[in-house]
Swiss-Prot record:
Pfam families: GIY-YIG, HHH_5, UVR, UvrC_RNaseH, UvrC_RNaseH_dom. GO terms for biological process: nucleotide-excision repair; SOS response. The lineage of its organism: Bacteria, Pseudomonadati, Pseudomonadota, Gammaproteobacteria, Lysobacterales. The UvrABC repair system catalyzes the recognition and processing of DNA lesions. UvrC both incises the 5' and 3' sides of the lesion. The N-terminal half is responsible for the 3' incision and the C-terminal half is responsible for the 5' incision. Keywords: Cytoplasm, DNA damage, DNA excision, DNA repair, Excision nuclease, SOS response. Residues 207-242 form the UVR domain. The gene is uvrC. This is UvrABC system protein C.
Amino acid sequence: MSVRPHNDFDGKAFAAQLSTAPGVYRMYAGDDTLLYVGKAGALRKRVGSYFNGTPKNARLTSMLSQVARMDVTVTRSEAEALLLENQLIKSLSPRYNVSLRDDKSYPYVLLTREQWPRIALHRGPRAVQGRYFGPYTGVTGVRETLSLMHKLFKLRSCEDSVFRNRSRPCLQYQIGRCSGPCVDLVAAPDYAESVRRATMFLEGKSDQLGEEIMHSMQQASEALEFERAARLRDLLSSLRSMQNRQYVDGRAADLDVLACATQSSQACVLLLSFRDGRNLGTRSFFPKTNGEDSADEILGAFVSQYYAEHSPPREILLDREIPEAELIEAALSTAAEHKVALKWNVRGERAGYLLLATRNAQLTLVTELTSQSAQHARSEALREMLGLAEPVKRVECFDISHTMGEATVASCVVFDASGPVRGQYRRFNISGITPGDDYAAMRQAIERRFRRAVEENGVLPDVLLIDGGAGQLAQAQAALADLGVENVLLVGVAKGEERRAGHEALIMADGRELRPGAASPALQFIQQVRDEAHRFAITGHRGRRHKARMTSKLEDIPGIGPRRRASLLKHFGGLVGLKAAGEAEIARVEGVNAALAARIYANLHGLALPDAAGEASPQ
């Protein structure tokens, strides 16, 4: 249902025609900017409450004065409305909602769902079918867990492309960290049992798992299966050793602790996580607020949004009561398919965890405010130097990286007044240009980034930095002009004398040059953005170059065509396996004779190449 009045929006009339069903409502400004998303147990009553009487604070007054239209979505329950509200806030970023700003995806342990499951670190969208365990507050925790999984349960970690094409076990098998399912060195039922036990461990059931292994060990011993009993004994010993090292508190087996600190219209939510009694560390979040949101409102919004994307533990400790706690608890329990308890009045060890989280949240917020203050000062200095009337809300910077024209990559990094916005960084693999032509590379990258913005009505930067001189800047100008992009201030960042930091020249689109000097906060801001663009570009370039060089090693060998190349890679499970093989092993591949095997071996190891005379034509 949607109403767009010609003049002032009549909120009372709109609310009067709504049903009393639960649902989600959205408020829009006259230019269709989304102002606010909210949920309601009864739409008519909740929406009507905004327009009956005087708004209770300045934020509401400002928001309601801009409303030009509203629309609603009816849901089956208030819990369903809560979930939809969180999805819309995350995807649409309404101006007046508290929203979780999380530029990095959390790492998880992924256990795939296939005949021979693999276990691996995973970030990003859950495109792979399987169980996701986490989230972990850092990669270190995931790697420690994976190391334990390989040691205890010997599950494979290799990609499917390698797994399907191996003809002999890899190094992981040789050092006892994989059971070798790729070459049938473990029976399917035994591997499935290892997967089941690994799942129990990851679910926090290590005590139950230990009892089960002990029972199986006793059964094997009674059946005189001494080798199996010995393996189970070693597994149990490793499991107990791990538990003794890593348990912090047996009563904190599966627990998240959340504390919220507020100061100067800023907020910090600190998350302390325990899984299976292990302290996984802390992570800090700085939600976008409107300055008048209370700490309990901020924390409530965080709980709803964060656990809409991450699996909640069975117990979540909060440093304060949050609005609609029972509803949120019910929604989380439904989504997680297990009971989730929100608690704030706790004693003993749990009270200690809350105190620890609260102190850390306060300290982290003070540190962040100090850092933000300096960052905002540099951003304001940039505005003044460039003569802009409005604050600089978004800066983008492009850089090009290649090795003598090879594997050219362009980077685009994004900063706002608070610092880098890493979730919006982009890389562009450049193709179809003369190798080493930085001008063409820059133009292609600019065209690709801004064409998409034009087609999708995407956000544009206030300032666009180009790492380069007048030539690079001219290419960016031409690309933007072709696309009809206006109101973006272009600035070229040219190397200074002897390429020394602090001596950079800033080239404006009208040809002027600015040399603010090393002490300028504005130049320090530009240097920070430029250096980040350079880092991001060169990292992408090195990865692309390495991949290309690894692939091309076989292509450079006379006598190796597409068919033989595919046979070699399939037989050895990839270039790494082929490089580890000797000449005799290579010669056993169909279509490869001894002479060709010698040439392949020499090429891969940087040795003098034997004469290619007498070899068959490439296949």
